[in-house]
């Protein structure tokens, strides 16, 4: 890797529009416009596929309005979720099947790409030979509970998912962040795409593990200046989001959570209580 700024432009050969961006969206009327508009500002993105996952708000209506001015924007609709599938995985798999580009960029409806983000991702792929490039987004925090808990949670996750280890082909460590996960189409198809991780709640990490196990190079790094996300806009949403994911992220067993608590700063139990994280115990 070079020491260039994260926003530096990719070499001319990689600046052609070669990326299909895929955005699963369920009830994202407050965020979808900013996300789509940020994708539309990336010259390297040839098409934007928003997959409306049975929204009951104005998400689809907003996207249809944006289609009038963003000609490379398409709206897809999911049907019933097949048995054994997580809803989001079904949505992104539908988008991937419809996409035409040699690179697939999976991002979330609450993510906003910064200028030069797609070019930087392609540049990293070119320089490192990575078939999967992922950034851990810059987290936007506004409320007191976001400012208190989001940095804490991400500091703990950094302990488990070392960028250096993930990017080392000799290490079995693998991770990615689904808020910005770009993958070469051929590599994606060869490991079975999201169909191979259909039931995984942490589909981004599962996909990275499958890619690395198959011999593909990964690149994972910080996303400051690349992509920004405000994950939760209410305490209730944060409660539901992290209690679903945090248990799995730290190891998926009661013992792993206890070890995490032992090694963390003293107020981690408070954070777990605030998030409503329940550790299963044998009955």
PLM region descriptions:
Residues 38, 52-62, 80, 111:
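A conserved acidic beta->alpha catalytic loop
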Residues 58, 109-124:
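Acidic donor-binding/catalytic loop of UDP-sugar-dependent glycosyltransferases
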Residues 17-20, 47:
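Cell-envelope/extracellular polymer assembly enzymes that use nucleotide-activated donors
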Residues 30-34, 57-66, 75-77, 116:
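Acidic helix N-cap motif at the loop->helix transition within catalytic regions
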């Amino acid at each position: 890797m070079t020491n260039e700024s994260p926003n530096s432009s990719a070499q001319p050969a990689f600046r052609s529009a070669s990326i299909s961006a895929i955005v699963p969206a369920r009830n994202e009327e407050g965020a979808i416009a900013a996300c789509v508009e940020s994708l539309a500002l990336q010259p390297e993105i040839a098409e934007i596929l928003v997959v409306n996952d049975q929204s009951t708000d104005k998400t689809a209506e907003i996207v249809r309005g944006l289609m009038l001015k963003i000609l490379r924007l398409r709206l897809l609709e999911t049907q019933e979720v097949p048995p054994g599938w997580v809803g989001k995985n079904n949505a992104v798999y539908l988008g991937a099947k419809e996409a035409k580009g040699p690179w697939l960029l999976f991002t979330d409806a609450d993510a906003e790409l910064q200028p030069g983000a797609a070019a930087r991702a392609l540049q990293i792929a070119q320089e490192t030979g990575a078939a999967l490039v992922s950034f851990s987004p810059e987290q936007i925090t506004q409320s007191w509970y976001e400012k208190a808990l989001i940095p804490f949670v991400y500091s703990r996750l950094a302990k488990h998912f070392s960028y250096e280890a993930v990017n080392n082909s000799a290490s079995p460590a693998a991770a990615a962040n689904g808020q910005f996960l770009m993958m070469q189409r051929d590599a994606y198809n060869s490991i079975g795409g999201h169909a191979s991780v259909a039931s995984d709640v942490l589909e981004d990490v599962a996909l990275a593990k499958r890619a690395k196990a198959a011999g593909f190079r990964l690149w994972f790094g910080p996303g400051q200046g690349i992509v920004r996300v405000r994950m939760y806009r209410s305490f209730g949403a944060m409660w539901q989001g992290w209690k679903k994911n945090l248990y799995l992220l730290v190891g998926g067993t009661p013992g792993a959570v206890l070890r995490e608590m032992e090694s963390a700063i003293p107020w981690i139990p408070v954070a777990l209580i605030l998030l409503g994280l329940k550790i299963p115990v044998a009955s």
